[in-house]
Amino acid sequence: MTKHIAILRGDGIGPEIVAETVRVLDKFIAQGLDADYEYAPLGGEAYDEYGHPYPEFTQNLCRKADAVLLGAVGSPQYDNLDRPLRPERGLLAIRKDLNLFANLRPAVLYPELANASTLKPEIVAGLDILIVRELTGDIYFGEPRGIRVLENGEHEGYNTMKYSESEIRRIAHVAFQSAQKRSKKVCSVGKANVLETTELWREIFEEIGKQYPDVELSHMYVDNAAMQLVRAPKQFDVIATGNIFGDILSDEASMLTGSIGMLPSASLDENGKGLYEPSHGSAPDIAGQNKANPLATILSLAMLLRYSLNDEARAQQVENSVQKVLQQGLRTGDIYEEGTKLVSCSEMGDAVLAAL
């Protein structure tokens, strides 16, 4: 049965990195992958065309699709729009609309990039962490929220942090099942000493953990976890955490690898449908200059093949091809160092295709 993929180019470098990734997808389709794809706008591109960052056309296409591939959203030119109309709101809206509750962000350090990390090679060599972040709850979506005027005339901003038992249960299962395929360790991260939300989180993880006796469960406060990621990151296998803590920790973990331009991500629903995107932003400063690193987006396609199309063989083919071009010494500007060859976005795409 043909799988349908919605492709959202987005803003900034989004169209460039997506173009290189689609070339890989086209090659697989030509070789017999039973899939097709259609483009739709999201973010600033969608606002320009439809007046909304997540328009009805895009909603309908994404709801019908088996998987969604996204470039990046956001650009300073939209900063003065009302908050609900800004490009980033399109990303929040699609996650909520498709009920993409589980965000998987690998932080893997390729041996060829060991010197690109800001940490000493002996601390990060062989790093392979997976951060499992809950995406649709927590303080980003909690109500009530807003800015109000107090009786004394002072303005006050307020937000609501909350998690239901069912929300925690389903993300816990994703974390434990992910760990079973890896090194069988889950570290649950929160702030249970001061936040009731994460106190409940810890209790539920303890309960669910009993269903996975082969997986070792530990707990860590988020401030300590942030420190340990820099001090001794290889102690971690799967880190499971809520929306706001996961947002921060996954960006921190990404820099252990030397470049956020290397890191893919998957956001999944309960049935394996997913949104796949690079972990980096839209980099408007280099947009349209053929300088962007397409590898995180190409690796996001590998995750799409693995999780939504159940095609492990092609997923590994993509990952092996990326490793091969790194072994050949090819580098975009973000991962370039002396002794390697600086290439453009499209040249990196050429190299991955050749390696396939």
UniProtKB/Swiss-Prot annotation:
Site label Important for catalysis, positions: Y140, K191
UniProt record, GO biological process: L-leucine biosynthetic process
Family matches, as Pfam families: Iso_dh
EC number: 1.1.1.85
SS bond list: none
Family: Belongs to the isocitrate and isopropylmalate dehydrogenases family. LeuB type 1 subfamily.
Assembly and interaction partners: Homodimer.
Protein name according to UniProt: 3-isopropylmalate dehydrogenase
Lineage of the species this protein comes from: Bacteria, Pseudomonadati, Pseudomonadota, Betaproteobacteria, Neisseriales
